[in-house]
């Protein structure tokens, strides 16, 4: 038998480190009924050496654990599970790893079998590189804007280099979500700053914060220069095809704009949260507003917006291309 541990490992706000209480609870419960033949596989994201601390608390030998980090994306999780880019297995017990590998024998992708620490690092460094790539595009966006270049043409020309690629290579208000921010914090926490200098990795979050400020300032400047009556941010979640508001760039931009612009609203057709006040603000627009597309949205939303814009000559509309 194989037991998968798939519990959250959020960031503890007070200590700014990984919170292992859910993982500890799950491991403890499994340990109470454990037998030597049971393959315990941790899919939860956990920094190197933290699992040893958890196992010590519950009286379990950490060397008996196997690891199988998940790489599912919100909005495409089912497809990602059945069609993964790769499967990573980690551990020191070869017999348990063999059983785990047999479970995935029907999957058409490379299976990487490695040690526990390496399997954990693969997940963390993947979630470090992706926001690094997004931050590069956003910094490039600011440089292109400053230089007066054509944003779409420049990014396409760079991305067509097959060493770079166009996937995950578009500008955004900033990046967010439930994984990238916390994983980057944890990466920067599990190495000794006195012994290891990682200037690139240690500044990714700062780059993102700077870009969020830049986004807000550009929206504000455009709003003021055109003497508009309000701003409509289109898309509330942290990315398209999800309703997850955690660490949403839209939320951050909204807060920054709200301090100086009275009429700032967020338009979203996917979010269904009882804590959000809903009203047909868009249908009642009769004064000049700035529409900002925070990320690509579905055709239905764009068709509705285009109809509203057609019916009003006083609306300024910009896709994400500040």
Regions found by a protein language model. Give the residues of each.
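Structural/interface elements that position substrates and couple domains in central-metabolism enzymes
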Residues: 1-322
């Amino acid at each position: 038998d194989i037991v998968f541990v798939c519990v959250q490992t959020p960031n503890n706000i007070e200590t700014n480190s990984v919170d292992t209480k859910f993982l500890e609870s799950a491991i403890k419960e499994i340990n109470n009924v454990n037998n030597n033949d049971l393959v315990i596989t941790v899919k939860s994201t956990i920094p190197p050496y933290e699992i040893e601390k958890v196992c010590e608390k519950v009286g379990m030998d950490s060397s008996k654990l196997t690891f199988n980090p998940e790489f599912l994306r919100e909005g495409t999780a089912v497809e990602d599970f059945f069609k993964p880019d790769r499967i990573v297995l980690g551990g020191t017990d070869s017999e348990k790893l063999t059983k785990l590998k047999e479970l995935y024998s029907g999957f058409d992708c490379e299976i990487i079998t490695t040690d526990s620490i390496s399997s954990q690092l693969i997940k963390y460094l993947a979630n470090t590189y992706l926001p690094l790539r997004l931050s590069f595009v956003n910094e490039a966006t600011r440089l292109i804007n400053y230089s007066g270049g054509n944003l779409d043409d420049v990014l396409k020309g760079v991305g067509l280099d097959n060493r770079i690629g166009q996937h995950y290579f578009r500008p955004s208000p900033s990046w967010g979500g439930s994984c990238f921010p916390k994983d980057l914090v944890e990466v920067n926490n599990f190495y000794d700053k006195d012994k290891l200098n990682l200037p690139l990795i240690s500044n990714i979050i700062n780059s993102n914060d700077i870009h969020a400020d830049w986004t807000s300032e550009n929206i504000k400047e455009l709003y003021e220069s055109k003497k508009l009556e309000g701003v409509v941010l289109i898309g509330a979640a942290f990315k398209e095809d999800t309703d997850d508001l955690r660490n949403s760039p839209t939320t951050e931009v909204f807060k920054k704009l709200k301090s100086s612009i009275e009429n700032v609203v967020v338009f979203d057709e996917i979010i269904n949260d009882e804590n959000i006040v809903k009203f047909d603000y868009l249908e009642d627009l009769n004064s000049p507003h700035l529409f900002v597309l925070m990320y690509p949205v579905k055709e239905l939303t764009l068709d509705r917006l285009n109809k509203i814009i057609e019916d009003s000559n006083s609306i300024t509309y910009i896709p994400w291309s500040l």
